[in-house]
C-alpha cells in the first residue's frame, strides 16, 4: 500500500470540519487499506506508531532535527528552511513547498516524468520505528539520516504529513471515537455495528488490534472478545452528585461505599512473572513504580489477572496518606530508588476485571470484590480499599466525613446487585462520587481542556496569561467552550505554559473545537486542567450545552480559577458537557437581573 494514499486522505480530512464527513471519509480510507497492515494504518491515523500502553519510545525528534532532515532531503540550506518555517508556522508545509520546488526545478520535473519509487506504508512505518527505537552514541545523526531518506523519496504531499506525523501534529481533527465509528462503517456493515466495536475497544484499548481482529475474523468475533492481559481495559467512570439522599436513591437504597483516594488510579496486569501497571490514560507507568511491582508479586495470588486500585503516597513514619502532589514530586526525581525511600506508596485495590482466563467485567460487583479480597495476602503495602456497606443516609455521611478526615477526597458509592457489572469505558450511575468539594457553591471541580490562549498586558504583554477552556461532548466528539481562566497560575507556571502552548498552537480553530469566542491563538486540544469556580451560569459567549438551558446561550463558569494540571487525563477524559449541565441543574439557583456584561469569561 502506497503512503501517498494516506497522505491524500489526510489532505482531504484536514479541510473538513463536519464530524459526519470526517467519519465517512475515514471509513473510505480504511476500506481501501491493505488488510495485512490495517493495524499500522490505524496507528498512523491516530498519529502514533504503537499504542501508548506498550511503553515504547516516542519518535523524539525536535524542531532542529526536523529542520536538518528537511534541509538534507531538499538540498536547501538550514537558514532558508528556518526562515520559511517562521513565515508559515508549519514544518509540514515547509517540507511540502520545498519538495514542490525541488520537483519543478529538477530535470525530471522539467520533462514531466519521474523515476521515483513509491513510498509504501510498510517502509514509512519500519523506518520511523527505527528512528524511535534508535539510542546510544551516534543515534542523533542516524535518526536524521533515516528521516531525510524518507523525505527524499516522498512527494510533496507525503513529505508534509510525514513531518507532521513526526512532530505529533497531524492536524486532521480525528479522535478515537471517530475512528471507532469509521471502523464500524468500513468493516461492520454500517453505523449499527458501532456498539460492538466500542465494546471491544473498551475491553482492549488498542484500535489497531481491534481492526486486525475484524478484518481477519469478522465483526462477529468481537462479540465474544475477552480482556487480554497486557492490553489495558478502558476504566469504568463514575457520575457525580452532591446530595447523599439522592445518591442512595440512584443506587437502589443500598450500596458498597469506598474511600475515594487522592492518588493515581492504576490498572495492574499480571501474566506469569510479568507485571504491568497502566495509568488512567492507559499509559504504561510500570517503570515509575518498581516498588508496586514487587508488592503485587509478593502479596496478590494468581498467575494471570487484571485488577484495579489507587496508588497513594504515604508518610514513611506514620503511614498516613499524603496528597496527590507527593506522587508528582516522586515522579520528578531522576533516581527512582531514592524517590521510593522519600515518597513511599500503598496500593488500595477496589476492583477485579479478569482472573485466570475468566472475564469478570460481566459479573456483579459483590462477586468481583469477594474474589479480590480472597487473593490479597495480609500485608502493609497492598490493601483492599477502605469500605462499608450502607443502606441509610446517616451511615453514608458518617463514612464520608471519616474519609475526609483521613486524607481522602471523599467516597465512591457503588451499586450492588446482579446488574452491577464493570462498565468498561462508560460513565454511569452504578458508581457515584461524593467529594468534599461538593460543599462549595459550585458542586465540584471540573477537568477542562485548553483550546485557546489570550495574551496579557503589562509585564505579561506578548505572553499567554489566560486560557480558553472547554468541556468534552462525547456525543459529537467535540470540545465546547466553558470559560476563560486567568487566575490561579504562578509566574513560574505561566512561563512554563507559554513554552508548552507555543509548541501546539494552531493558525485556525481545531475542527473538534466548538467556540464562539476567538482567542489570540488556537491550541491543539491536548492539555487538561482542574478548574474551580464560584458557580455555573448561563452565558451567551460560550457553547457548552448551547440552546439546552436557554436559546442562543450556553453554560459557563463564573470566576474560574486554575487548580492544577491533570496529566493523568486525556482530553476525552475531561468533564463532559452533560456533567456540566447536571452540575448546573443541581446547584442552588439565584434570580439575577439580566446583566449587560457576562462576568463568566
Curated annotation (Swiss-Prot):
The active site of this protein is located at 260
Picking any one GO molecular function of the record gives: metal ion binding
InterPro entries of this UniProt entry? ATP-dep_DNA_ligase (IPR050191), DNA_ligae_ATP-dep_bac/arc (IPR022865), DNA_ligase_ATP-dep (IPR000977), DNA_ligase_ATP-dep_C (IPR012309), DNA_ligase_ATP-dep_cent (IPR012310), DNA_ligase_ATP-dep_CS (IPR016059), DNA_ligase_ATP-dep_N (IPR012308), DNA_ligase_N_sf (IPR036599)
Query: Residues that bind ATP, according to the entry?
Result: 258, 265, 280, 310, 350, 427, 433
Fetch the SUPFAM superfamilies from UniProt. ATP-dependent DNA ligase DNA-binding domain (SSF117018), DNA ligase/mRNA capping enzyme, catalytic domain (SSF56091), Nucleic acid-binding proteins (SSF50249)
Give the UniProt keywords, A-Z: ATP-binding, Cell cycle, Cell division, DNA damage, DNA recombination, DNA repair, DNA replication, Ligase, Magnesium, Metal-binding, Nucleotide-binding
The catalytic activity of this protein is classed by the Enzyme Commission as 6.5.1.1
Q: Which cofactor does it need?
A: Mg(2+); Ca(2+); Mn(2+)
What's known about how pH impacts activity here? Answer: Optimum pH is 6.0-7.0.
Temperature sensitivity? Optimum temperature is 60-80 degrees Celsius.
* Disulfide bond positions: none
Give the top-level enzyme category. ligase
Biological process GO terms, please?
A: cell division; DNA biosynthetic process; DNA recombination; DNA repair; lagging strand elongation
- State the similarity comment: Belongs to the ATP-dependent DNA ligase family.
* Role this protein plays: DNA ligase that seals nicks in double-stranded DNA during DNA replication, DNA recombination and DNA repair. Also has low activity with dATP. Inactive with NAD(+), CTP, GTP, UTP, dCTP, dGTP or dTTP.
User: Which PANTHER family does the UniProt record give?
Assistant: DNA LIGASE 1, DNA LIGASE 1/3 FAMILY MEMBER
* The protein, known as: DNA ligase
| Name of the gene | lig
Amino acid at each position: 500500500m502506497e503512503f501517498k494514499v494516506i497522505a491524500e486522505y489526510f489532505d482531504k480530512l484536514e479541510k473538513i470540519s463536519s464530524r459526519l464527513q470526517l467519519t465517512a471519509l475515514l471509513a473510505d480510507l480504511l476500506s481501501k487499506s491493505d488488510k495485512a497492515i490495517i493495524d499500522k494504518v490505524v496507528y498512523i491515523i491516530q498519529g502514533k506508531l504503537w499504542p501508548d500502553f506498550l511503553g515504547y519510545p516516542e519518535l523524539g525528534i525536535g524542531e532542529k532535527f526536523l529542520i536538518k532532515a528537511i534541509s538534507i532531503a531538499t538540498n536547501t540550506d538550514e537558514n532558508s528552511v528556518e526562515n520559511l518555517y517562521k513565515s508559515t508556522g508549519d514544518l509540514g508545509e515547509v517540507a511540502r513547498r520545498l519538495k514542490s520546488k525541488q520537483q519543478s526545478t529538477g530535470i525530471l520535473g522539467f520533462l514531466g516524468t519521474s523515476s521515483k519509487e513509491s513510498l509504501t506504508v510498510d517502509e514509512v512505518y519500519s523506518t520511523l520505528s527505527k528512528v524511535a527505537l534508535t539510542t546510544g552514541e551516534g543515534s542523533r545523526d542516524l535518526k536524521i539520516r533515516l528521516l531525510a531518506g524518507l523525505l527524499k523519496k516522498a512527494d510533496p504531499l507525503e513529505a508534509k504529513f510525514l513531518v507532521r506525523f513526526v512532530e505529533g501534529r497531524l492536524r486532521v481533527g480525528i479522535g478515537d471515537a471517530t475512528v471507532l465509528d469509521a471502523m464500524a462503517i468500513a468493516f461492520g456493515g454500517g453505523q449499527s455495528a458501532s456498539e460492538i466495536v466500542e465494546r471491544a475497544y473498551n475491553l482492549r484499548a488498542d484500535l489497531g488490534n481491534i481492526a486486525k481482529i475484524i478484518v481477519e475474523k469478522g465483526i462477529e468475533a468481537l462479540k465474544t472478545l475477552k480482556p487480554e492481559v497486557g492490553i489495558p481495559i478502558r476504566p469504568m467512570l463514575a457520575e457525580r452528585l452532591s446530595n447523599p439522599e439522592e445518591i442512595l436513591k440512584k443506587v437502589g437504597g443500598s450500596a458498597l461505599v469506598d474511600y475515594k483516594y487522592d492518588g493515581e488510579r492504576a490498572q495492574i496486569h499480571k501474566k506469569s512473572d510479568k507485571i504491568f501497571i497502566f495509568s488512567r490514560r492507559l499509559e504504561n507507568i510500570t517503570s515509575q513504580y518498581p516498588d508496586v511491582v514487587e508488592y503485587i508479586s509478593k502479596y496478590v495470588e494468581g498467575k494471570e489477572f487484571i485488577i484495579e486500585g489507587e496508588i497513594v503516597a504515604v508518610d514513611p513514619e506514620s503511614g498516613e496518606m499524603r496528597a496527590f502532589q507527593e506522587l508528582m514530586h516522586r515522579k520528578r526525581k531522576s533516581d527512582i530508588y531514592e524517590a521510593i525511600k522519600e515518597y513511599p506508596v500503598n496500593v488500595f485495590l477496589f476492583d477485579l476485571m479478569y482472573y485466570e482466563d475468566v472475564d469478570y467485567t460481566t459479573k456483579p460487583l459483590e462477586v468481583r470484590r469477594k474474589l479480590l479480597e480472597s487473593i490479597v495476602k495480609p500485608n502493609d503495602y497492598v490493601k483492599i480499599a477502605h469500605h462499608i456497606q450502607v443502606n441509610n443516609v446517616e451511615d453514608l455521611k458518617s463514612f464520608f466525613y471519616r474519609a475526609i478526615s483521613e486524607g481522602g477526597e471523599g467516597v465512591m458509592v457503588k451499586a450492588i446487585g446482579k446488574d452491577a457489572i464493570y462498565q468498561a469505558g462508560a460513565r454511569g450511575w452504578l458508581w457515584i462520587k461524593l467529594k468534599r468539594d461538593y460543599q462549595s457553591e459550585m458542586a465540584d471541580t471540573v477537568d477542562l481542556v485548553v483550546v485557546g490562549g489570550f495574551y496579557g498586558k503589562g509585564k505579561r504583554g506578548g505572553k499567554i496569561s489566560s486560557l480558553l477552556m472547554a468541556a468534552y461532548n462525547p456525543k459529537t466528539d467535540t470540545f465546547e467552550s466553558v470559560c476563560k481562566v486567568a487566575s490561579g497560575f504562578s509566574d513560574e507556571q505561566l512561563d512554563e505554559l507559554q513554552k508548552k502552548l507555543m509548541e501546539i498552537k494552531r493558525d485556525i480553530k481545531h475542527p473538534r473545537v466548538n467556540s464562539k469566542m476567538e482567542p489570540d491563538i488556537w491550541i491543539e486540544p491536548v492539555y487538561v486542567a482542574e478548574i474551580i469556580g464560584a458557580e455555573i451560569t448561563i452565558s451567551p459567549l460560550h457553547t457548552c450545552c448551547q440552546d439546552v438551558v436557554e436559546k442562543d446561550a450556553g453554560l459557563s463558569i463564573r470566576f474560574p480559577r486554575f487548580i492544577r494540571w491533570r496529566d493523568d487525563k486525556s482530553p476525552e477524559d475531561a468533564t463532559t458537557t452533560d456533567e456540566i449541565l447536571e452540575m448546573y441543574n443541581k446547584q442552588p439557583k439565584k434570580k439575577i437581573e439580566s446583566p449587560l456584561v457576562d462576568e463568566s469569561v
